[in-house]
UniProtKB/Swiss-Prot annotation:
Belongs to the low molecular weight phosphotyrosine protein phosphatase family. Thioredoxin-coupled ArsC subfamily. The active site is at C10 (nucleophile), C82 (nucleophile), C89 (nucleophile). One of its GO terms (molecular function) is protein tyrosine phosphatase activity. This is Arsenate reductase.
Amino acid sequence: MSKKTIYFLCTGNSCRSQMAEGWAKKHLGDEWNVYSAGIEAHGLNPNAVKAMREAGIDISEQTSDIIDPDILHNADLVITLCGDAADKCPMTPPHVKREHWGFDDPAKAEGTEEEKWAFFQRVRDEIGERIKRFAETGE
């Protein structure tokens, strides 16, 4: 059986979609080809790498990419992770299922360094739980 393709999209392919790609490779990698991209490519956020490493997942080799029309049009499932991506994502063909799983942007966290770091950890855990639920239930 060939693998299905899941494509995670957010604004800059820097934090949320990168963490989603890492979690999905862990929980869905046997059944899905996992990709992520952004409306723009802002580069991999070092705190996203650090947060995922803390959870035992290495995303340091992932790249920050803009949306690839070939992957977008051939994906089985496209998931937007922020309102900006949901609004600006290019049209997907009717056969491509599209869902929106909204998460706060950890790159916009304010406060002390500890508060910003806690924000990254929270969003990391929320994305991980959502992907784990999808892996277990298909929803």
